[in-house]
Structures are given as structure tokens and as C-alpha cells.
Amino acid sequence: MKTVVKSYFGSHLYGTSTPESDVDFKEIFVPPARDILIGNVKEHMSKNTNNTSSKNTKDNIDHELYSLKYFFKLAADGEPVALDMLHTPPELVVKSDLPDVWKFIQDNRSRFYTTNMKSYLGYVRKQASKYGVKGSRLAALRDVLKVVNQIPEQWVDYQEDGSIKQRRTKVEDIKHRLPENEFCEWVFHNHEKTGPQTFYTVLGRKYQTTLSLIELKQSLNKLDAEYGERARKAEANEGIDWKALSHACRGGLQLLEIYKTGDLVYPLQDAPFILDVKLGKHPFKTVQEFLEDVVDQVEAASTEASKNGMQQKVDMSFWDDFLERVYLENHRSYYK
């Protein structure tokens, strides 16, 4: 096995580490030639010093390894771990058996930038939705509730013979009545195993068309209650996962930098602010408004980047060709 790169990750990469931070390493490797040939490659491995369910301490080391092929997939999917690794500065690299391979990847990292970095943006949106009580979001939720709370939970089907049959009302039955806006929309997925599926999404939560109206009501009313409780806790700075919130702020700022400058530099310019968020030094309302504003800015910057020619999807043929060359050279050096 040859190491393409092994480097520091997490807070040590972002510039947000504290004396209590554990150490994270990420590594990309080229698997042994024989394992590739016989189809016995482990694409993803972990070597952690803490194998218990207890929280890591500053003495723990997390070490995750990805095959080069798997890393390219993660990067193409817009996974934060891969996009973060692409921007590792040289001083945080601790090992590289194939420095030319790593240099080529870093020199061409912009080929992984798209206007649709779903996994990355998805995480930021999820946190914004989780902690956001923005008026427009709440209004959108209550517009849906206004509709569903008025519809009978039993649906009547009229049979050809004139008889009637009662059953539970489903989301499918009322789809023409459900509002559509920036927070509520229909999405379609063509799943490999289950085939085409349709979902109604409300504030990022998905509801399949086969779901009963009763279940939809329960979920949405619970969400409405959570928003109310969240607003109360926000005033008192209670129940906030500051670390998760800091990750969301960081992710949003990183995406914004990529869309605006075409690159990303570590340690982050905003590292002091992100660290303060992580340590709970800012009022929740301040962070909440900041995060919601960043999400709006990222959406706008993504649209602008698209107009300026940024691709919507990663061209994997480029990376497949490169992967072939690297693996072929690996085979030749092993079997010479």
C-alpha cells in the first residue's frame, strides 16, 4: 500500500483547535496491486485509538484511510471530508509516498467544484433548518399545516359498482392542494432498488406519497411545536449543539469562498469567529442570523458561479483516466 497523502484534519486543519482537541488524520492510499487485481480492496478503513463509545480526549487519535478511487467518489459527491482534504496546506502533510500524484490532484482540485455540491450544502442547510426559526420558514410550515389540518383523515373511493370504500387519506391524494415554495417542494428520486419515488419536502424533511395524512399531520405538528420550543431555548441559549453549529457556519463560509474566489485557503480567515461559536461565546440569536444569512449568500453565489461557467457536475472521465494511470504504474512497479 502506498500513501498518496496523510495529513492533519479537523480543527487542526481549520485553525479552530483548542488544547483539548483530539488529533485527526486522513489518508489517501493506492491499494496493493494484487488486491486490486483480485478485487480484494478495502476502500475505507479506520485506525482509531479510542474504540469505545466514550467521547474522544486530547490524547486520542482518529485516523481514517480512503483508497484513491473511493476518495474521488467522495469528492465528486461533494462530501465535506474530501473537499476539505483537497485544500490541505503543505505544512499539515505528514507523509506522502506519491507526492507527484498528490500535487496533480491539488493542482486540479477546481475540477471537483460544482454549483451543486449537494452533500456539503446539504449539511449546512440541515443545520440552518435545525436551528433556524426564521419567520419565512415558520410561515411556510404553517401554510402546509393550514391545508392538512382541514382535510379528513379518511378518504372515500367510489367503486365502479356504485359502492364506496373508505381508507386512510394519503399524501398522494392531496398533492394538488399542498403549497410549493422555496421551503416546500416535490422531489423525485430514481432509487436503484425501489425504483422511482416521489417525496413532498417541508423544511428539508421528506414525506413519501404513500405516507398517510395522519402520519404527515403528526410529523408537521411536532415540527411546529419544536420550532416554538426552539425559539424559547434560543432566548435562553439552552440546548444548543455549538460544535455542530460551528461546523455549519464553517461549511457555509467555505462554500462561499469557493464560489466567490474559485479556491479555498486553510487555515480559514474566519477561524477565530468559528472557534468562538464552537465555544458558545456568541448569543445563539447572533449565530442563528449569521448562519441563515450565509445560506442565502451561498445560494446566490452558486447561481452567480453557474452564470460564470462553473460546472453542474464533475467530469469523472478526467479522474478515471488519471486513476487508471496511477493504478497502472502501481502494477508495473509491483510486478516488474
From Swiss-Prot:
PANTHER family: NUCLEOTIDYLTRANSFERASE. InterPro entries: RlaP. It comes from Enterobacteria phage T4 (Bacteriophage T4). It comes from the Viruses. This is Uncharacterized 38.9 kDa protein in nrdC-mobD intergenic region.
